[in-house]
């Protein structure tokens, strides 16, 4: 039976360690500061932002919320980003996505100072990642790598298959895996023989948003399975992209949903906010 990779427990330890680091920074008059820009009133975004703020307060990160109305123009949003870019007391900027219709998300991402881009979405951050240079990266991939590390799962030399090619998970995770000496394949909706490909993976990452997309017939015995998906079934039950009950007897390790990758994402956001604050403190 597979080991369950407990993201709640690992994230709790990460946050506790960060709290100590932040207390040490406070002795040098440095308070890690995260600016969150929320445009409109997307319910899912509201929940996620509240969770971020709660975690920030728990560990001593200063979290500033900038709410902008649904009718915000592109020019007004870019002006707010520019203002935050030039504020010397702000270490990290996060514009909560998705933005309301009519706003150009990529233009907003491009406008964020790469040295404050805590999501790692800017072209400069992406370039640094693929050049294997120090940079912040998207929080979910960062959290996945931290979770694997916490369980001493070494990716070097492993065959990794990532199902999903989003800029939020699949692509940046591929970069991190390559930088840690894994052999990586990204699969997607146009990939032929996808389940056969998945079955060749030593480490299988699934991020497609389709409940129980992967079952026992697509997993190699002994594989590590990372389930990034989270959906709700007709009965309201939270479901992952992987059928855990079917796959757990085959895999060597698996992330539960909920309680696997999800908690690691916010912990990773906090960790990278602290990293950016340290950079500011060191000049």
From Swiss-Prot:
Residues that, per the record, bind NADP(+): 164-166, 189, 230
Record keywords, A-Z: Amino-acid biosynthesis, Histidine biosynthesis, Hydrolase, Methionine biosynthesis, Multifunctional enzyme, NADP, One-carbon metabolism, Oxidoreductase, Purine biosynthesis
Alphabetized InterPro entries for the sequence: Aminoacid_DH-like_N_sf, NAD(P)-bd_dom_sf, THF_DH/CycHdrlase, THF_DH/CycHdrlase_cat_dom, THF_DH/CycHdrlase_CS, THF_DH/CycHdrlase_NAD-bd_dom
Pfam families reported in the protein's UniProt record: THF_DHG_CYH, THF_DHG_CYH_C
GO cellular component terms given for this protein: cytosol
Metabolic or biological pathway, per its Swiss-Prot or TrEMBL entry: One-carbon metabolism; tetrahydrofolate interconversion
PROSITE patterns to which the protein is assigned, alphabetical: THF_DHG_CYH_1 (PS00766), THF_DHG_CYH_2 (PS00767)
Function in brief: Catalyzes the oxidation of 5,10-methylenetetrahydrofolate to 5,10-methenyltetrahydrofolate and then the hydrolysis of 5,10-methenyltetrahydrofolate to 10-formyltetrahydrofolate.
Family per similarity comment: Belongs to the tetrahydrofolate dehydrogenase/cyclohydrolase family.
Protein's name in the database: Bifunctional protein FolD
Upper lineage: Bacteria, Bacillati, Bacillota, Bacilli, Lactobacillales
